[in-house]
């Protein structure tokens, strides 16, 4: 079970009574039973593997019921994020995305990748899109190889964002050239989300 980056001692425990006795769960495991997954903090390989595992588990439990992915992330690794993205597209259940707090960089990309019509932003959340970051040191030939790779990744991410947002590729390429911060309403107008929520629908 992926427990977001919160000190373990501070993670609440939920106790449930049943005819079989008493069971306790950490709050994130309990919410997973309700098909809720949290993507919080930096996107990195360990987090991505655990989120992918949770999505695959929930698909096996019920392939016809939505999965709810709550995002509060500054972004992070592109390859880790793409593992989550590809799984979201691969599995049968719709993945409903919610931005709470912030969805920046890869966080915004994953927010936008939710099921069409089921992408939400809470009204005071912030969304930020930009081009991928990279840095490399070494021989000139190696730097050239890595420069080609990051340009390929930039083009791929922009094409996918254009596809999910409904914007044309040229506008996405222009708008992601530098850090581009948006309110929840601006993210809706851009096509990154479908609705801004202040109350549960």
Swiss-Prot record:
Q: Extract the GO molecular function terms from the UniProt entry.
A: ATP-dependent peptidase activity; ATPase binding; serine-type endopeptidase activity
| Record-linked NCBIfam families | clpP, PRK00277.1, PRK12553.1
User: Which enzyme class?
Assistant: hydrolase
List the residue ranges forming a coiled coil, or say none.
Answer: none
PANTHER family from the entry? ATP-DEPENDENT CLP PROTEASE PROTEOLYTIC SUBUNIT
UniProt keyword list: Cytoplasm, Hydrolase, Protease, Serine protease
Q: Which family does it belong to?
A: Belongs to the peptidase S14 family.
Query: Which reaction(s) does the protein catalyse, per the Swiss-Prot or TrEMBL entry?
Result: Hydrolysis of proteins to small peptides in the presence of ATP and magnesium. alpha-casein is the usual test substrate. In the absence of ATP, only oligopeptides shorter than five residues are hydrolyzed (such as succinyl-Leu-Tyr-|-NHMec, and Leu-Tyr-Leu-|-Tyr-Trp, in which cleavage of the -Tyr-|-Leu- and -Tyr-|-Trp bonds also occurs)
The UniProt function text for this chain reads: Cleaves peptides in various proteins in a process that requires ATP hydrolysis. Has a chymotrypsin-like activity. Plays a major role in the degradation of misfolded proteins.
Is Membrane included in the keywords of this UniProt record?
Answer: no
Catalytic residues (UniProt): 105 (nucleophile), 130
Write the Enzyme Commission number(s) for this entry: 3.4.21.92
Biological process (GO) annotations held by this record are: protein quality control for misfolded or incompletely synthesized proteins
Gene Ontology CC, one term:
endopeptidase Clp complex
- InterPro entries referenced in this protein's UniProt entry, alphabetically: ClpP, ClpP/crotonase-like_dom_sf, ClpP/TepA, ClpP_His_AS, ClpP_Ser_AS
Q: At the top level of its lineage, which domain of life is listed?
A: Bacteria
Q: What is this protein called?
A: ATP-dependent Clp protease proteolytic subunit
Subcellular location as annotated: Cytoplasm
Q: How does it assemble?
A: Fourteen ClpP subunits assemble into 2 heptameric rings which stack back to back to give a disk-like structure with a central cavity, resembling the structure of eukaryotic proteasomes.
Look up keyword rRNA-binding and say if it applies.
no
Identify one Pfam family in the record. CLP_protease
